[in-house]
A protein has these predicted regions:
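Acidic (Asp/Glu-rich) catalytic motifs at the cytosolic membrane interface
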Residues: 1-27, 61, 65, 124-138
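A general, composition-driven signal for non-globular sequence regions
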Residues: 8-9, 33, 239
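Aspartate-rich (DDxxD/NDxxD/DxxxD) Mg2+/diphosphate-binding motifs
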Residues: 18-40, 70
Length: 269
C-alpha cells in the first residue's frame, strides 16, 4: 500500500510538471528563443521520467526490502482492498482517456510502434504512467489479498518490490524515448511522407534536393532546398515561393516555420 501511495504522490507531481511544460511550450518565438520553446516539454517529460524512477521505483523497492528485513503485519486489509479497487477504477478511466487520444493519431500502427515513433511526449508519459499505475494496483491487490489470506506479511513486501521494479523498467523505457526527442528528431514518418508528396506535386518545384524536418513539441520546422522552375525574374520566383509556402502552411497546420532555399534549374525554359 505504501508503494502505491508513493507512486500516487509521484504521479500527481508529474501531472503538474507536464502542465507546466505544456504551458511553457506555447510561448511564442523570442530573441533568445528564435524557434520558440516547443521542445521544453521534452525537458519536463524527462524530469517526470526521473521522478517516476526515483520517487516511484527506488522508494517502492526500498520499502519492500525494508519490509522483508523487518516484517510488519498487515492492518485493516479490507480497507486496503477497498482503496485499491477504487484507485483501479479511477486509473482505468484515466487510461481509457489516454488510449482514446492515442487512437486518434496512431492510425494502423500497433501501440508499441506508436510509442517508439511518437513525438507527443506528454501523451506518451501519461499513457505509460497510467498503464504502470494500473499494473501496480494489480500487484498491490494480489499482495494484500495474499497477505490477508495467509497472514504472512512476506507477500506485501514482495508486492512493493514488484511495483518498484515495474516503475523502474517503465521509467527507463520512457527516458530512452524522451532522450531521443531532446537530442532532436524529425517529424513523424507519416508527416514527413505527406510533406514530401505535397512538395513533389507542386508545379513550381522541379526536384527536392534536401528536406529537413525538426519536431519542436507539437510544432514542426521545415527546411527545404529545391530546384524551382526557371522564372523570368527573381520577383516572380519569390512570388512562387510565397505561394507554395502559403499553400503548405494551410495544408500542414502543425508546421510553424518553413525555410526555403531555391536552386534554379538552368536548363528549364
Amino acid at each position: 500500500m505504501l508503494a502505491e501511495g508513493l507512486h500516487s504522490i509521484a504521479d500527481t507531481g508529474n501531472q503538474g510538471l507536464l502542465l507546466l511544460g505544456l504551458s511553457q511550450a506555447k510561448k511564442p518565438p523570442s530573441v533568445r528563443h528564435p524557434l520558440g520553446q516547443g521542445r521544453v516539454i521534452y525537458f519536463w517529460s524527462f524530469i517526470v521520467a526521473l521522478m517516476l524512477f526515483s520517487m516511484g521505483g527506488l522508494l517502492s523497492s526500498y520499502e519492500g526490502v525494508d519490509r522483508l528485513i523487518a516484517p510488519v503485519q498487515l492492518a485493516s486489509p479490507g480497507i486496503a482492498i477497498a482503496i485499491l479497487l477504487f484507485a483501479a477504477i479511477a486509473e482505468g478511466i484515466s487510461l481509457r482517456a489516454a488510449v482514446h487520444e492515442i487512437n486518434k493519431v496512431r492510425g494502423e500502427r500497433s501501440y508499441w510502434t506508436w510509442f517508439k515513433e511518437s513525438r507527443q511526449s506528454a501523451l506518451l508519459i501519461v499513457a505509460a504512467e497510467d498503464s504502470a499505475a494500473l499494473a501496480g494496483l494489480v500487484f498491490a491487490f494480489t499482495a494484500v489479498l495474499a497477505s490477508a489470506i495467509t497472514g504472512n506479511p512476506l507477500y506485501d513486501a514482495l508486492g512493493s518490490i514488484a511495483i518498484g521494479g515495474l516503475l523502474i523498467v517503465v521509467a527507463i523505457t520512457v527516458s530512452v524515448q524522451i532522450k531521443s526527442l531532446l537530442v532532436g528528431e524529425s517529424a513523424a514518418p507519416e508527416v514527413r511522407l505527406a510533406i514530401t508528396r505535397f512538395l513533389e506535386n507542386s508545379p513550381e518545384i522541379i526536384q527536392i534536393d534536401s528536406l529537413i524536418t525538426l519536431q519542436q513539441g507539437d510544432q514542426v520546422i521545415v527546411l527545404l532546398k529545391a530546384e524551382f522552375r526557371n522564372e523570368p525574374s527573381a520577383i516572380k520566383l519569390l512570388a512562387d515561393m510565397q505561394q507554395i509556402k502559403a499553400a503548405f502552411l494551410a495544408a500542414f497546420p502543425q508546421v510553424e516555420m518553413v525555410y526555403m532555399e531555391p536552386m534554379i534549374h538552368a536548363s528549364q525554359p
